[in-house]
A protein has these predicted regions:
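Short, function-defining helix-loop hinge/capping sites that tune catalysis or transport
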Residues: 26-27, 40, 102-105
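Glycine-rich N-terminal loop/short-helix segment of MobA-like nucleotidyltransferase
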Residues: 21-36
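Active-site beta-alpha turn of Rossmann-fold NAD(P)-dependent dehydrogenases/reductases
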Residues: 18
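Phosphate-coordination/substrate-recognition cap region in phosphate-metabolizing enzymes
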Residues: 47-160
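Short, Lys/Arg-enriched N-terminal segments with co-localized hydrophobic residues
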Residues: 1-10
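Short catalytic helix/loop segments, enriched in acidic residues and glycine
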Residues: 32-48
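Short non-domain terminal segments
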Residues: 1-2, 28, 56, 62
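Extreme N-terminal starter segment of soluble prokaryotic enzymes
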Residues: 11-15
């Protein structure tokens, strides 16, 4: 039997922040991997998040972010608020939002009417039931979005891949 005793452990903090409201959030559209701008409200939300972090007086060692503009812009607004440089951002496409496949760009309420509220909920929240794949010809497909040009083609999803 082993007993380990550690007298002093200084625990760190993990801060998780979702991006501020995007233009497509405002329009109630399935966004997923499409690169959309923050809305004015989203920019305010990011600055408020920065103020909260500033009040907590955390020293932050690493900043991780998805490839998505709305997330990067949210983080940059936070960093500006807490007076940190934005050259410390580590981007990883694996942190991107859920991919909504063929639902991308469609209105959520209209899809609830068409597919039923329960089915839309399943597509939005389940781990094992992805929406139909997005056509590779769609302008919303990640293969057709400049942001994702560096991701190996075989890793670019057509729909959610949790």
């Amino acid at each position: 039997m082993y007993i380990f005793y550690i007298k002093y452990i200084k625990m760190g903090h993990l801060i998780l922040i979702r991006h501020g409201q995007s233009e497509w959030n405002l329009q109630n559209k399935f966004t997923g991997w499409v690169d959309v701008e923050l809305s004015p409200q989203g920019k305010l939300e990011a600055c408020k998040a920065g103020e909260l972090i500033k009040e907590l007086n955390f020293k932050i060692d690493y900043f991780f972010c998805s490839y998505q503009k709305r997330s990067i812009d949210t983080l940059k607004l936070i960093l500006n608020t807490i007076r940190e440089k934005d050259d410390q951002i580590i981007k990883a496409w694996e942190l991107n939002e859920r991919h909504y496949g063929a639902l991308t760009g469609l209105n959520k309420d209209e899809m609830k009417k068409k597919l039923g509220e329960e089915q839309v909920h399943i597509f939005r929240r389940s781990w094992d039931t992805p929406p139909e794949p997005l056509s590779k010809n769609s302008p919303y497909h990640p293969l057709n979005i400049e942001t994702y040009k560096d991701i190996p083609r075989e890793k670019v999803p057509d729909t959610e891949s949790l």
